[in-house]
C-alpha cells in the first residue's frame, strides 16, 4: 500500500545522472561509478550512505528533520528501554498533536551484529559530507536548505530529553543499572554547502531515501480526507462501517507501526468489530 515519495525535482535530473529510490536500491552494485547524493537521513538514508562510502563512493547526504537515537543505552538495546518505560504504549490521548506525531520521521536505527550506533557523526567520520534538506534542482545545481545546524541541534535536544526520561525511570526502578554514556553532539560543518553542481562535483547518481506515501489506488471507497489520506479514528474507518486499518503510524499507540505493536491494535479492533456485528452490522 506504499509507494516511494520522490520530490518533483527528481524528474528534472539530467539523463546521465542515475535516479534510484531506496526501495529499488539493494547494494552499491546498483549505483554507477562516481559520487552519490543521498537525500534523506532516516534509517535507510544513513545505511545507504554508509554502504556507499564503504564501497569507495564520495557521498553527500542531504539532511532534513530526523530522529536521532542510539542503538544501545545503559547496557541494553534502546527498544528495550522504550518498551520498559512505557513510551511505546503511549496512546492517542497521551499526545498533544496527533497529526505531528504521525508525521515524525522514523528513528535513525540500524540493526547490525555488533549493535553499533549509526548516526551522522559516524558518517562524517567515514568521509560523508553533510548538507541541509534537499530544496530543489535547477540548471544543473542541487539546492539545499540552510537549516542543517538547526535540525541537528533539535534532534540532539530531543535525544537528550529521551535519554533523561530513561535515566529518571531507571533511578526509580533499577538504580543499580550501569551509568549511561551520552552520545556526543552532532558534528555539523561550519559552512555546509547550499548548492552543488552535480556535473562539476562528479555526482553520477542520486538515491532518494525520502520515505513512502500511501498508495490506495486499489481502494474504491469514499474514505479519504482532502489530502488523500485514509480517514480513520484509531483504525476504525468511520465513513465505511466494517472497514478497518492496521499497521499505520501511531494508529492507536506509538508502537502501532512495529510488528510487535500490531497485536494490541488488532485486539482492540477485533473487539470493535465484534461489537458492531453483534449490533447488527
Language-model regions, residue ranges each:
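Flavin (primarily FAD) cofactor-binding/catalytic cores of flavoenzymes
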Residues: 1-281
Amino acid at each position: 500500500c506504499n509507494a516511494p515519495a520522490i520530490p518533483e525535482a527528481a524528474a528534472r535530473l539530467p539523463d546521465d545522472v542515475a535516479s534510484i529510490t531506496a526501495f529499488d536500491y539493494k547494494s552499491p552494485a546498483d549505483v554507477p561509478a562516481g559520487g552519490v547524493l543521498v537525500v534523506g537521513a532516516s534509517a535507510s538514508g544513513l545505511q545507504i550512505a554508509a554502504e556507499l562510502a564503504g564501497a569507495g563512493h564520495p557521498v553527500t547526504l542531504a539532511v532534513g528533520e530526523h530522529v536521532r537515537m542510539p542503538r544501545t543505552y545503559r547496557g541494553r538495546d534502546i527498544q528495550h528501554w522504550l518498551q520498559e518505560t512505557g513510551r511505546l504504549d503511549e496512546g492517542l490521548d497521551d499526545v498533544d498533536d496527533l497529526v505531528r506525531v504521525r508525521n515524525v520521521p522514523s528513528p535513525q536505527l540500524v540493526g547490525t551484529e555488533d549493535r553499533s550506533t549509526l548516526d551522522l557523526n559516524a558518517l562524517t567520520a567515514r568521509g560523508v559530507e553533510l548538507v541541509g534538506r534537499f530544496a530543489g534542482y535547477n540548471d544543473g545545481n542541487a539546492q539545499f536548505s540552510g537549516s542543517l545546524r538547526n535540525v541537528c541541534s533539535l534532534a540532539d535536544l530531543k535525544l537528550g530529553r529521551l535519554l533523561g526520561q530513561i535515566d529518571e525511570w531507571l533511578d526509580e526502578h533499577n538504580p543499580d543499572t550501569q551509568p549511561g554514556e551520552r552520545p556526543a553532539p552532532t558534528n555539523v560543518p561550519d559552512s555546509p554547502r547550499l548548492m552543488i553542481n552535480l556535473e562539476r562535483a562528479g555526482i553520477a547518481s542520486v538515491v532518494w531515501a525520502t520515505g513512502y506515501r500511501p498508495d490506495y489506488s486499489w481502494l474504491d471507497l469514499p474514505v479519504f480526507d482532502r489530502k488523500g489520506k485514509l480517514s480513520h479514528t484509531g483504525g476504525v474507518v468511520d465513513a465505511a462501517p466494517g472497514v478497518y486499518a492496521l499497521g499505520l503510524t501511531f494508529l492507536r499507540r506509538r508502537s502501532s507501526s512495529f510488528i510487535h505493536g500490531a497485536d494490541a491494535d488488532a485486539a482492540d479492533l477485533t473487539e470493535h468489530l465484534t461489537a458492531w456485528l453483534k449490533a447488527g452490522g
